[in-house]
Amino acid sequence: MTDEMRFFIFLIENYACEKQLPTADVLRTWEEKGLVQEIYDSYPLYHTERIDNAYEDIENLSKTGKHLW
C-alpha cells in the first residue's frame, strides 16, 4: 500500500469521525461530488499541514469545487 493510500484512509476515517458520520457516507458523498481523486491527489499538501487544514479545504472543495488555498 502506498503512503498516499495510507494517508487517504487515515484522512477519510478521521474526517468522518470529526463530522460524526459513517466513513461509508463520507466516501459516497465524495464520490457523488467527484472529489475522491482530487482529495487523494492532494496528499503532498494535506500530509504536511494540520489535519484541520485538510478538513477546511475539503469542506471548501465540497461547496465550491475549488481548493481553499
Description of each model-found segment:
Residues A16-E18, P22-Y46:
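Amphipathic, hydrophobic secondary-structure cores in small proteins
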Residues M1-F7, Y40, E49-I51:
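Charged, low-complexity, helix/coiled-coil-prone segments
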Residues F10, N14, R28, D41, ...:
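Charged/polar, solvent-exposed surface patches and flexible loops
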Residues M1-D25:
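N-terminal acidic leader/helix
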Residues Y43-W69:
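Long, compositionally biased
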